Amino acid sequence: MVLSAADKGNVKAAWGKVGGHAAEYGAEALERMFLSFPTTKTYFPHFDLSHGSAQVKGHGAKVAAALTKAVGHLDDLPGALSELSDLHAHKLRVDPVNFKLLSHSLLVTLASHLPNDFTPAVHASLDKFLANVSTVLTSKYR
């Protein structure tokens, strides 16, 4: 799915509003995913998945950092996320459906924290962006 210039502007503006809360929102999205889709917990057997866990916060920060990198490279997501794609496809072997579940959880988290900025257009742009990120992360599964 190609991001239009308007989509790119919406994604950059929305992520800019996330600002210093990116790691916090990443952790919240992970917690939301674990609660809403319990099967996703199977990829984290060594984590303390309780609310406020340092491990969930740490992984949330990694998710946020990857998304921040992606936002900075909207015209070259495959290049920006190549190493992460390799990791998830070849080492971690994460089922691709889980990226959609995390994307949904991220959208809900962003909507809850940015209600005045989460317009239908921004929602659509972020959804397209996260779908593109998911596509890139699963591109090396073949």
Swiss-Prot record:
Residues 2-142 form the Globin domain. The modification N6-succinyllysine is found at residues 8, 12, 17, 41. GO terms for biological process: hydrogen peroxide catabolic process. GO terms for molecular function: haptoglobin binding; heme binding; iron ion binding; organic acid binding; oxygen binding; oxygen carrier activity; peroxidase activity. The modification Phosphoserine is found at residues 4, 36, 50, 103, 125, 139. The modification Phosphotyrosine is found at residue 25. Keywords: Acetylation, Heme, Iron, Metal-binding, Oxygen transport, Phosphoprotein, Transport. This is Hemoglobin subunit alpha-I/II. It comes from Bison bonasus.
